[in-house]
Amino acid sequence: MDGMFAMPGAAAGAASPQQPKSRFQAFKESPLYTIALNGAFFVAGVAFIQSPLMDMLAPQL
């Protein structure tokens, strides 16, 4: 029962010390990363919709 329901890496984590997280890894795990990523996607989408490229892709009805 021990191997089937154990968390992956639980046994190995106790024996070996954890490496300190880099600044980027700590930022990537923070909620600010999700907010910044979604904000960047939103800005890119608005810029694409407002661009002349969108006018060229849309059919002229």
Swiss-Prot record:
Keywords: Acetylation, Membrane, Mitochondrion, Mitochondrion outer membrane, Protein transport, Transmembrane, Transmembrane helix, Transport. InterPro entries: Tom6. The chain crosses the membrane at residues 32-52. Residues 53-61 are mitochondrial intermembrane. It is a single-pass membrane protein. The keyword Transferase does not apply. One of its GO terms (biological process) is protein insertion into mitochondrial outer membrane. Residues 1-22 are annotated as: Disordered. Residues 1-31 are cytoplasmic. Its main location: mitochondrion. It comes from the Eukaryota. Component of the TOM (translocase of outer membrane) receptor complex responsible for the recognition and translocation of cytosolically synthesized mitochondrial preproteins. TOM6 is involved in assembly and stability of the TOM complex. Belongs to the Tom6 family. Forms part of the TOM (translocase of outer membrane) complex that consists of at least 7 different proteins (TOM5, TOM6, TOM7, TOM20, TOM22, TOM40 and TOM70). This is Mitochondrial import receptor subunit TOM6. It comes from Saccharomyces cerevisiae (strain ATCC 204508 / S288c) (Baker's yeast).
